[in-house]
Amino acid sequence: NVKDAVKDADIIVPNKLIIDKSVLEGSSVKMVCEAATGYNNVDIDYCKNAGIRVTNVSGYSTESVAQHTVALLLSVYEHLDYYCSYVESGEYTRSKKFSHVDCQFHEIAGKTWGIAGLGAIGRQTAKLAQAFGAEVIYYSASGNAYDVLYQRVDFDELLEKSDIISVHCPLNEKTQGLFRADAFKKM
């Protein structure tokens, strides 16, 4: 039981556990240190009203998350699972053709990479996208992000102009349900 586990603690360090009134009420918790960059699992309003400070570990995974974003894109764009299976099956060595191109390859260079959320991870992803030769545009769900290196666009424009979209914004009331079916139809 989380409530019992935290009742006598001054500081708790959760990750993914729901930390809300039902957990915190009647406890001696003075600070919640979320062991992640996102903290949508913490009831911020309750904590604020109860005088409980909330922090996270912003920046701890910026490079690795941006790198993983590019790795996932390359896996999809280059059909890596398909081609790895093709080679591992022995079909490549048995083929009389010089090359096997049943699945089309895509170039990132020259594409428009749209980024939803230009915080630290979004900015790092933008740098990597540019290194591959992509033009970067971004949408700021909060309306607070401004960056002179990249063109800021509204959400619909991001959907319509982007060849690639990666999402790096926190899950909150402004972003929950942002990418619904109607958004995908605009892509």
Predicted features along the sequence, with ranges:
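Phosphate-binding beta-alpha-beta segment of Rossmann-like dinucleotide-binding domains, i.e.
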Residues: 58-112
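Rossmann-like dinucleotide/phosphate-binding beta-alpha-beta segment
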Residues: 99-186
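An N-terminal-biased, well-structured beta-alpha scaffold segment characteristic
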Residues: 1-55, 160, 180
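Short, charged, surface-exposed secondary-structure boundary motifs
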Residues: 41-45, 64-68, 146-150, 163
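Short beta-strand elements at the ligand-binding edges of bilobed clamshell
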Residues: 53-59, 152-155
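Short low-complexity, flexible loop/linker segments enriched in glycine and/or proline
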Residues: 9-10, 70-73, 151-154
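Residue-level detector of anion-binding/catalytic polar loops
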Residues: 53, 75, 79, 135
